[in-house]
Amino acid sequence: MTCILGIETSCDDTCVAVYDTNNGVIFNQVYSQSQLYNYYGGIVPEFSARKHLEILIVLLKNIFKKGKISKNLIDAVAYTAGPGLVGSLLVGASVGTALAYSLKVPVVLVNHMEAHLLTPMLENIKPTFPFLALLVSGGHTQLINALGIGEYELLGETLDDAVGEAFDKVAQALGLGYPGGSNLSKLARSGIPGTFNFPRPMINNSNLNFSFSGLKTFVLNIIQKNNNDFQIKANIAREFENAVVDSLVIKCIRALKKLKYTTLVVSGGVSKNDVLRMHINRIIKQYNYKVFYSHLKYCSDNAAMIAYVGSIRYKKFKSLNLEIKINPNWSIVDLAKI
């Protein structure tokens, strides 16, 4: 049995978890800063780092007190080393390294995007390699050829705004506050289909890249030309969401055909979007493919996925060198560069 304590502080959520290779996730706690950023309309990196520093120690104490987990059970401390916000990453790395030192255990550095990609492995029914992965979050939109653990090939990515970023900016223009993506999706449910017709970016391009900046600008112009009527806002939200989802689904099917794969994994914060899941499920059934998602509680940032990947990388990549390491731009396709 291997027991890994995980720490995730790459952006604005402070997360801790413990993963046991025999029993799975035995402790998982997330502190969200979203209410703080509703006032600002988005994340303020310096505030995020300060809040991590304030909250992380409290959450770690909860592992041993509320979770009643003995410190002697911990075999290693895994923390997110990138990609992410510099200040936020440094808090997790510093505290994680100090904790490992105090427990006399090694550290394991985990790539945030690899952790998202592998989160469906926490479920009872797991995907098998190789498969196509769609990673969709506030900062990333990528299509990955997943050949095996640690073996990833980038097939396509956004050339500008990530999906989550585009959602947040359109939501802000609609006056929906932060977090924008979930608020926009709620509003979209009241929208009347077919009222607007927005472009589906790059769907006619043969490559597997995405682009959402043009769509975002197009929608922002539509918002400016219309009044603040609730129904109009809902109609705009619905068509924008459909345009984004269509773009993602079309590229996924194109990539699956290109690779001659039959398995798709969808991970990241945006993967909990019910419209995205509905469209993917429909098209996957049509082609007789298989699709795997993260559990809804593991779609957004969490430390369970960090602890899990830490358990996989433990034997090969654990380090007793307690030098604090982060890489804000750490790519999933170049895991050796940390």
Curated annotation (Swiss-Prot):
Residues reported in the UniProt entry to bind substrate: 135-139, 168, 181, 273
Cofactor detail note: Binds 1 Fe(2+) ion per subunit.
Keyword tRNA processing: yes
Catalytic activity: L-threonylcarbamoyladenylate + adenosine(37) in tRNA = N(6)-L-threonylcarbamoyladenosine(37) in tRNA + AMP + H(+)
Main location: cytoplasm
Family matches, as InterPro entries: ATPase_NBD, Gcp-like_dom, KAE1/TsaD, TsaD
Compartment(s) of residence: Cytoplasm
MF terms in GO: iron ion binding; N(6)-L-threonylcarbamoyladenine synthase activity
Cofactor: Fe(2+)
Enzyme class: transferase
Keywords: Acyltransferase, Cytoplasm, Iron, Metal-binding, Transferase, tRNA processing
GO biological process annotation, one example: tRNA threonylcarbamoyladenosine modification
GO CC entries: cytoplasm
Tagged with keyword Signal: no
EC number: 2.3.1.234
Binding site residues for Fe cation: 112, 116, 301
Protein family membership: Belongs to the KAE1 / TsaD family.
PANTHER family, alphabetized: TRNA N6-ADENOSINE THREONYLCARBAMOYLTRANSFERASE (PTHR11735), TRNA N6-ADENOSINE THREONYLCARBAMOYLTRANSFERASE, MITOCHONDRIAL (PTHR11735:SF6)
Function as written in the Swiss-Prot or TrEMBL entry: Required for the formation of a threonylcarbamoyl group on adenosine at position 37 (t(6)A37) in tRNAs that read codons beginning with adenine. Is involved in the transfer of the threonylcarbamoyl moiety of threonylcarbamoyl-AMP (TC-AMP) to the N6 group of A37, together with TsaE and TsaB. TsaD likely plays a direct catalytic role in this reaction.
Protein name (Swiss-Prot/TrEMBL): tRNA N6-adenosine threonylcarbamoyltransferase
Gene: tsaD
